[in-house]
């Protein structure tokens, strides 16, 4: 009887596979080689502890869905259970139990514990580079503000170091366009040709864009383009040292105006640099990433890593379909 049941379930899985489709997930599953990712994830589980109760690649794929669509842990669990195309993508059969939210929480903790909160994007990008989508001809740099998951602590609480009922010790204040912000800032470098994210860092909102320039620009590109916030003698020297063409928009010296030719150059560079805004627009509109979901830098750094991977995988499926 048990054998018959398993056979029936196998037939049902095959039937589902043949009729349930999600173009994005189908294309992604075919385009990306999951083996090196699975190997990296498996290394988090020592052989002495035995086989993990849930395959880590299943949890990784669930995390991708979660961050791609801006879902909470319970929402992700519910939708994977409900949507057959999502089950198929993550690698669960019709009869398989869906990992619960606690399992997702433990998985993220394990990723952070093994330092993968700053390494997963590089792992994905190796494949994008091998496929010829990251060309390194030109890198665009910019930053965007992210609201904290909690409100800013009251002044009295801050003075006492009490953030239990509000605030995040790693978030900070800044003002942009005369509007106060409390939270974080994502610093991003994008390969111009296909607008793929090459590097990201996360800081408190108060950190100036220019301070993360050398942490996100790799020095292997031919040109770097960034807005006036990055204009400084230090960065000019960095470009010379690394033999990278300097496309940082120029600022006028105090009491002087930019020449007409420099204004035209700035306008041209600005039109190219604006491509990076597409990343921020997708994050905030589609991935619901106007604010961070967690408390503390390391948890939110992992979230930024996943959001960046999701953007690149979205772009990968589009690029693969047109080449």
Regions found by a protein language model. Give the residues of each.
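Basic, short loop/linker segments at the boundary and entry of helix-turn-helix/winged-helix-like folds
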Residues: 25-64, 68-69, 259
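RNase H-like polynucleotidyl transferase catalytic core
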Residues: 244-260
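Short N-terminal amphipathic alpha-helices
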Residues: 39-40, 52, 71-80, 323
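Secondary-structure capping and boundary motifs in well-ordered enzyme cores
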Residues: 33, 50-57, 96-99, 268, ...
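Basic, amphipathic alpha-helical segments enriched in Lys/Arg and hydrophobic/aromatic residues
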Residues: 237, 242-243, 262-323
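Polybasic low-complexity intrinsically disordered regions
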Residues: 74, 78-81, 90-95, 99-242, ...
């Amino acid at each position: 009887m048990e054998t018959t049941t398993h056979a029936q379930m196998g037939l049902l899985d095959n039937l589902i596979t043949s009729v349930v489709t999600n173009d994005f997930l189908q294309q992604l599953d075919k385009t990306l080689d999951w083996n090196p990712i699975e190997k990296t994830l498996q290394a988090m589980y020592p052989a002495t502890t035995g086989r993990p109760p849930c395959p880590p690649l299943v949890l990784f794929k669930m995390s991708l869905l979660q961050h791609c669509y801006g879902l909470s842990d319970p929402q992700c669990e519910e939708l994977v259970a409900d949507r057959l195309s999502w089950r198929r993508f993550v690698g669960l059969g019709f009869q398989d139990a869906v990992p619960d939210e606690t399992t997702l929480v433990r998985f993220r903790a394990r990723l952070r514990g093994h330092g993968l909160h700053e390494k997963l994007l590089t792992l994905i990008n190796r494949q994008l580079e091998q496929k010829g989508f990251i060309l390194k001809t030109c890198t665009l740099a910019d930053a965007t503000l992210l609201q904290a998951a909690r409100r800013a602590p009251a002044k009295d609480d801050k003075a006492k170091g009490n953030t239990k009922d509000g605030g995040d010790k790693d978030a900070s204040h800044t003002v942009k366009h005369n509007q106060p912000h409390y939270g974080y800032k994502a610093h991003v470098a994008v390969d111009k040709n296909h607008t793929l994210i090459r590097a990201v860092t996360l800081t408190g909102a108060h950190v100036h864009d220019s301070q993360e320039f050398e942490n996100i620009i790799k020095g292997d590109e031919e040109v770097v383009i960034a807005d006036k916030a990055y204009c400084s003698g230090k960065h000019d020297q960095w470009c010379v040292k690394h033999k990278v063409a300097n496309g940082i928009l120029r600022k006028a010296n105090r009491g002087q105006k930019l020449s007409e030719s420099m204004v035209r150059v700035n306008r041209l560079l600005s039109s190219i640099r604006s491509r990076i805004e597409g990343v921020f627009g997708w994050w905030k509109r589609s991935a619901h990433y106007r604010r961070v979901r967690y408390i503390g830098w390391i948890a939110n750094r992992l979230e930024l890593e996943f959001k960046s991977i999701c953007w690149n995988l979205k772009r990968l499926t589009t690029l693969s379909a047109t080449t």
